[in-house]
Amino acid sequence: MTNPLWGGRFTTSSNDIMKKINESISFDQALYEEDILTSIAHCKMLVNQKIISKYEGQLIIHGLEVIQKQIESGNFEFSTDLEDIHMNIEYSLKKMIGNIAGKLHTARSRNDQIATDLKLWIRKSIKKLEQQLHKLQSTLLNIAENHYDTIMPGFTHLQIAQPVTLGHHLMAYFEMLKRDRSRWQDLYKRMNQCPAGSAALAGTSFPIDRHFIAQELGFDSPTENSIDAVSDRDYIIEFLSNASICIMHLSRLAEEIILWCSYNFKFITLSDNITTGSSIMPQKKNPDAAELIRGKTGRIFSSLNHILIVMKGLPLAYSKDMQEDKEPLFDAERNLILCIEAMNSMLNNITINSENMLKAAEHDYSTATDLADWLVKHINLSFRESHEITGQIVKLAEHNKCKIHELTLTQLQKIIPSITEDVFSVLSAKNSVTSRTSYGGTAPINVLQAIKNGRIYLENTD
């Protein structure tokens, strides 16, 4: 038997290998809700334009609603012989209401149908991601507020650089997630044009109303060019690009969590309910959730690479290659949401070891920059001169195996005679962070203001 929906030109049916490589219902059934929404909007338009009768439209819409309930209750049998979600639904509709079902496909193609379905699905996914990122930002704010003045070492090159506060450090990730959310919002606006009614590629001779379908489905307008409408997958590429940037941010935080809970750092302790053990080493408590976030980052990156490679050589308009757009999209979205949830769970199940953070912040001459700044302010040196002198003082402390503030004033005056005892006031980690009051700096008073601004942002974007 040839395919019941496109087999008129064929005398034999597809062989098993062709069916196997051609089917997409095994994964595009995830689009059933969007496909039915698109079909209902298209059907309403056909009725409004008197292309089909009101009675026919009612039959079709009722049938589609029944099919949706069947799918959601698990009572719908998908068939690989029918290739994809569109044909599975249409064939089931035909069995239910007869040949009238065939009128639903008037003035449309699977090409514009799938493009519309995918945009609807991505819009829904953006809303889910926004909700999850909002929760994660709220968690970061809560921890930052509890630790707005908790001192920890700031790092460059993974070497202790300057003291900062944990609240300030976590608010850096809050800002990253703000940018991530902004990118999702920008994508939503840019992609919110409706491909429905573009048909295969050239539009249609039927007197359709594309503006009606666009409005019915919540789009801002119809797409402007029918060829572009069915061949465009920019919105998938942008979605995966945004997902890649977002998961990269999560991966950086995951890497820090892995470091911080290690024996060498001991900055944090992860709860048992978000860690795992070893099958051979009974003492182990592994940060597997963080490691899996880090690992899944490569998986999401590869999804973006996948679709870029698929699209790079395709002539206009539609090619079957584009069927390969869905699995990486669905996989990336599913894993990104899981990673956001896992990160949120980890952060809600950590204990901050503040004393260890402070001890680490006081090591490796972390206040050397404060000393250099003091020399500029009080001895009237250029920063380059103070940098050179501070380097000599650090070298002296290293030679004496002590911290800078443990050097005596006499020892310091051998390097720079005009230095006074006031210099010791800037050499503690606490005084260092308190002094960093420049806009966006790590001073606790700044962190509290940033947290306040963050809460206003979350209220306005809830």
Curated annotation (Swiss-Prot):
It comes from the Bacteria. It holds the Pfam family ASL_C2. Keywords: Amino-acid biosynthesis, Arginine biosynthesis, Cytoplasm, Lyase. The keyword Amino-acid biosynthesis applies. Its EC number is 4.3.2.1. One of its GO terms (molecular function) is argininosuccinate lyase activity. Pathway: Amino-acid biosynthesis; L-arginine biosynthesis; L-arginine from L-ornithine and carbamoyl phosphate: step 3/3. It is an enzyme of class 4 (lyase). It catalyses: 2-(N(omega)-L-arginino)succinate = fumarate + L-arginine. It is found in: Cytoplasm. One of its GO terms (biological process) is arginine biosynthetic process via ornithine. Its main location: cytoplasm. PANTHER family: ARGININOSUCCINATE LYASE. Belongs to the lyase 1 family. Argininosuccinate lyase subfamily. This is Argininosuccinate lyase. It comes from Ehrlichia ruminantium (strain Welgevonden). The gene is argH.
